Regions:
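Non-catalytic DNA-recognition/assembly elements of restriction-modification systems
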Residues: 1-53, 69, 179-225
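A residue-level signal for beta-strand positions that form part of recognition/binding surfaces
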Residues: 37, 58, 124
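Sequence-specific dsDNA recognition surfaces
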Residues: 41-95, 100-109, 120
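A short beta-sheet element
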Residues: 89-147, 155-169
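Conserved functional hotspots at enzyme active or ligand-binding sites that engage polyanionic ligands
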Residues: 152
Length: 229
Protein backbone atom coordinates (compact mmCIF):
# COMPACT_ATOMS: atom_id res chain seq x y z
CA UNK A 1 0.00 0.00 0.00
CA UNK A 2 1.27 3.46 -0.88
CA UNK A 3 1.89 6.06 1.79
CA UNK A 4 0.51 5.92 5.30
CA UNK A 5 -2.87 5.78 6.96
CA UNK A 6 -4.91 8.81 5.82
CA UNK A 7 -5.67 11.42 8.44
CA UNK A 8 -9.33 11.65 9.38
CA UNK A 9 -9.44 15.43 8.81
CA UNK A 10 -8.10 16.03 5.34
CA UNK A 11 -8.17 12.66 3.65
CA UNK A 12 -11.54 10.99 4.17
CA UNK A 13 -12.06 7.35 3.17
CA UNK A 14 -13.70 8.42 -0.10
CA UNK A 15 -10.53 10.20 -1.21
CA UNK A 16 -8.34 7.35 -0.06
CA UNK A 17 -10.39 4.97 -2.21
CA UNK A 18 -10.09 7.27 -5.23
CA UNK A 19 -6.36 7.60 -4.73
CA UNK A 20 -5.89 3.85 -4.39
CA UNK A 21 -7.70 3.41 -7.72
CA UNK A 22 -5.16 5.73 -9.35
CA UNK A 23 -2.29 3.87 -7.70
CA UNK A 24 -3.65 0.54 -8.96
CA UNK A 25 -3.71 1.90 -12.52
CA UNK A 26 -0.16 3.19 -12.12
CA UNK A 27 1.00 -0.17 -10.74
CA UNK A 28 -0.45 -1.93 -13.76
CA UNK A 29 1.41 0.42 -16.08
CA UNK A 30 4.68 -0.32 -14.30
CA UNK A 31 4.10 -4.08 -14.50
CA UNK A 32 3.11 -4.08 -18.16
CA UNK A 33 6.07 -1.92 -19.24
CA UNK A 34 8.87 -4.01 -17.74
CA UNK A 35 10.67 -4.37 -21.09
CA UNK A 36 11.21 -0.62 -21.57
CA UNK A 37 12.91 1.86 -19.27
CA UNK A 38 13.43 5.60 -18.92
CA UNK A 39 14.74 8.06 -16.37
CA UNK A 40 12.52 10.48 -14.49
CA UNK A 41 14.36 13.37 -16.16
CA UNK A 42 12.96 12.18 -19.51
CA UNK A 43 9.35 12.64 -18.40
CA UNK A 44 9.59 15.45 -15.85
CA UNK A 45 11.15 18.87 -15.36
CA UNK A 46 12.85 19.04 -11.98
CA UNK A 47 12.56 22.35 -10.11
CA UNK A 48 11.45 24.32 -13.18
CA UNK A 49 11.71 28.10 -12.98
CA UNK A 50 8.46 29.83 -12.05
CA UNK A 51 8.18 33.64 -12.14
CA UNK A 52 7.26 35.21 -8.80
CA UNK A 53 8.44 38.69 -7.85
CA UNK A 54 10.13 39.29 -4.51
CA UNK A 55 7.74 40.48 -1.79
CA UNK A 56 4.68 39.75 -3.91
CA UNK A 57 1.91 38.36 -1.71
CA UNK A 58 1.26 34.79 -2.83
CA UNK A 59 -0.08 31.53 -1.56
CA UNK A 60 2.45 29.75 0.66
CA UNK A 61 2.23 26.03 1.41
CA UNK A 62 4.48 25.05 4.29
CA UNK A 63 6.04 21.64 4.82
CA UNK A 64 3.83 21.14 7.88
CA UNK A 65 0.78 21.46 5.62
CA UNK A 66 1.77 18.60 3.32
CA UNK A 67 0.04 15.28 3.86
CA UNK A 68 1.91 12.05 4.51
CA UNK A 69 -0.76 10.08 2.65
CA UNK A 70 -2.87 12.26 0.38
CA UNK A 71 -2.49 14.70 -2.47
CA UNK A 72 -4.15 17.74 -0.89
CA UNK A 73 -2.43 19.95 1.73
CA UNK A 74 -4.13 20.83 4.99
CA UNK A 75 -4.15 24.51 4.10
CA UNK A 76 -2.05 27.52 3.09
CA UNK A 77 -1.34 31.15 3.96
CA UNK A 78 -0.97 34.35 1.97
CA UNK A 79 2.54 35.74 2.49
CA UNK A 80 5.04 38.02 0.77
CA UNK A 81 7.41 35.90 -1.30
CA UNK A 82 10.94 36.12 0.10
CA UNK A 83 12.28 32.80 -1.12
CA UNK A 84 11.49 29.12 -1.51
CA UNK A 85 10.43 26.72 -4.22
CA UNK A 86 7.79 27.99 -6.64
CA UNK A 87 5.11 25.88 -8.28
CA UNK A 88 1.84 25.98 -10.17
CA UNK A 89 -1.09 23.74 -11.09
CA UNK A 90 0.01 20.34 -12.38
CA UNK A 91 3.18 20.24 -10.28
CA UNK A 92 4.00 17.61 -7.68
CA UNK A 93 5.85 18.55 -4.49
CA UNK A 94 8.21 16.03 -2.92
CA UNK A 95 9.94 16.60 0.41
CA UNK A 96 13.67 16.01 -0.02
CA UNK A 97 14.88 16.17 3.58
CA UNK A 98 14.79 13.69 6.45
CA UNK A 99 12.42 12.79 8.11
CA UNK A 100 9.84 14.43 5.82
CA UNK A 101 10.83 12.30 2.82
CA UNK A 102 10.59 9.05 4.79
CA UNK A 103 7.26 10.17 6.25
CA UNK A 104 5.79 10.66 2.79
CA UNK A 105 5.35 14.45 2.69
CA UNK A 106 4.05 14.95 -0.86
CA UNK A 107 1.42 17.06 -2.62
CA UNK A 108 -0.28 17.41 -5.98
CA UNK A 109 -1.04 21.00 -6.94
CA UNK A 110 -4.36 21.42 -8.76
CA UNK A 111 -6.28 23.96 -6.69
CA UNK A 112 -4.61 27.27 -7.61
CA UNK A 113 -6.17 29.90 -9.84
CA UNK A 114 -5.27 29.93 -13.53
CA UNK A 115 -1.62 30.95 -14.03
CA UNK A 116 -1.20 31.41 -10.26
CA UNK A 117 2.28 30.79 -8.85
CA UNK A 118 2.55 29.65 -5.24
CA UNK A 119 5.61 28.94 -3.14
CA UNK A 120 6.80 26.90 -0.21
CA UNK A 121 9.76 25.30 1.53
CA UNK A 122 13.24 25.25 0.02
CA UNK A 123 13.20 21.58 0.98
CA UNK A 124 10.76 20.67 -1.79
CA UNK A 125 11.63 19.08 -5.10
CA UNK A 126 9.14 20.20 -7.74
CA UNK A 127 8.21 17.74 -10.49
CA UNK A 128 6.48 19.18 -13.56
CA UNK A 129 5.30 16.97 -16.45
CA UNK A 130 6.94 17.14 -19.84
CA UNK A 131 4.88 17.05 -23.02
CA UNK A 132 2.25 14.27 -23.21
CA UNK A 133 2.80 13.21 -19.58
CA UNK A 134 -0.34 13.51 -17.42
CA UNK A 135 0.51 15.53 -14.29
CA UNK A 136 -1.21 12.93 -12.08
CA UNK A 137 1.34 10.39 -13.37
CA UNK A 138 4.15 12.18 -11.53
CA UNK A 139 2.21 12.33 -8.27
CA UNK A 140 1.62 8.58 -8.42
CA UNK A 141 5.32 8.14 -9.17
CA UNK A 142 6.25 10.26 -6.14
CA UNK A 143 4.32 7.81 -3.94
CA UNK A 144 5.46 4.69 -5.81
CA UNK A 145 7.23 2.49 -3.20
CA UNK A 146 10.25 1.70 -5.41
CA UNK A 147 10.75 5.40 -6.12
CA UNK A 148 10.47 6.42 -2.46
CA UNK A 149 12.88 3.65 -1.46
CA UNK A 150 15.38 4.87 -4.06
CA UNK A 151 15.07 8.47 -2.88
CA UNK A 152 15.58 7.55 0.78
CA UNK A 153 18.60 5.35 0.05
CA UNK A 154 20.25 8.11 -1.99
CA UNK A 155 20.09 10.86 0.61
CA UNK A 156 23.34 12.58 1.53
CA UNK A 157 24.51 14.91 4.28
CA UNK A 158 25.10 14.96 8.00
CA UNK A 159 22.97 12.89 10.32
CA UNK A 160 19.58 14.50 10.88
CA UNK A 161 19.93 16.84 7.88
CA UNK A 162 20.16 14.38 5.02
CA UNK A 163 18.68 15.32 1.65
CA UNK A 164 18.18 13.82 -1.78
CA UNK A 165 19.03 16.06 -4.73
CA UNK A 166 16.84 16.84 -7.73
CA UNK A 167 19.57 15.47 -10.02
CA UNK A 168 19.48 12.16 -8.16
CA UNK A 169 15.69 12.01 -8.45
CA UNK A 170 16.02 12.65 -12.17
CA UNK A 171 18.28 9.61 -12.51
CA UNK A 172 15.71 7.16 -11.15
CA UNK A 173 15.18 4.43 -13.74
CA UNK A 174 11.61 3.23 -14.14
CA UNK A 175 9.48 1.25 -16.59
CA UNK A 176 8.36 3.36 -19.54
CA UNK A 177 4.81 2.60 -20.76
CA UNK A 178 3.69 3.38 -24.29
CA UNK A 179 2.30 6.81 -25.15
CA UNK A 180 -1.14 5.26 -25.61
CA UNK A 181 -1.03 3.58 -22.21
CA UNK A 182 0.05 6.80 -20.50
CA UNK A 183 -2.65 8.78 -22.29
CA UNK A 184 -5.32 6.27 -21.23
CA UNK A 185 -4.05 6.48 -17.66
CA UNK A 186 -4.33 10.26 -17.77
CA UNK A 187 -7.97 10.18 -18.88
CA UNK A 188 -9.00 8.09 -15.89
CA UNK A 189 -6.61 9.64 -13.37
CA UNK A 190 -7.67 13.21 -14.16
CA UNK A 191 -11.29 12.37 -13.31
CA UNK A 192 -10.25 10.67 -10.06
CA UNK A 193 -8.07 13.60 -9.00
CA UNK A 194 -10.80 16.09 -9.85
CA UNK A 195 -13.13 14.28 -7.45
CA UNK A 196 -10.42 14.24 -4.78
CA UNK A 197 -9.83 17.96 -5.19
CA UNK A 198 -13.53 18.81 -4.93
CA UNK A 199 -13.91 16.60 -1.84
CA UNK A 200 -10.87 18.19 -0.20
CA UNK A 201 -11.97 21.76 -0.94
CA UNK A 202 -15.40 21.03 0.52
CA UNK A 203 -13.81 19.45 3.58
CA UNK A 204 -11.56 22.48 4.01
CA UNK A 205 -14.58 24.82 3.89
CA UNK A 206 -16.45 22.74 6.47
CA UNK A 207 -13.42 22.69 8.76
CA UNK A 208 -13.07 26.46 8.48
CA UNK A 209 -16.76 26.90 9.27
CA UNK A 210 -16.43 24.61 12.28
CA UNK A 211 -13.42 26.53 13.57
CA UNK A 212 -15.36 29.79 13.24
CA UNK A 213 -18.64 28.67 14.80
CA UNK A 214 -17.47 26.34 17.59
CA UNK A 215 -15.75 29.02 19.74
CA UNK A 216 -18.87 31.19 19.46
CA UNK A 217 -21.06 28.28 20.54
CA UNK A 218 -18.79 27.56 23.50
CA UNK A 219 -18.88 31.24 24.48
CA UNK A 220 -22.67 31.38 24.25
CA UNK A 221 -22.58 33.96 21.47
CA UNK A 222 -24.94 31.89 19.31
CA UNK A 223 -28.46 31.23 20.58
CA UNK A 224 -29.39 27.59 20.03
CA UNK A 225 -32.40 27.54 22.36
CA UNK A 226 -34.87 27.43 19.48
CA UNK A 227 -33.15 24.60 17.62
CA UNK A 228 -35.23 21.43 17.65
CA UNK A 229 -33.53 18.03 17.58
Amino acid sequence: RYGRKPSEWQYPPTNDNLQQQAFALFDRLMIEAVDTECQVSEIAYLNPKRPLAKNKVARCIDMSQLSTSGAFPSGWEMKPFTGGMRFTNGDTLLARITPCLENGKTAYIDFLDDEEIAFGSTEYIVLAPKEDIPPEYLYCLARYPAFVDYAVKNMNGSSGRQRVSADTIGQFVMPCPSETAIKDFGKVASALFMKMKNNSLENLKLSSLRDTILPKLMAGEIDVSNIQF
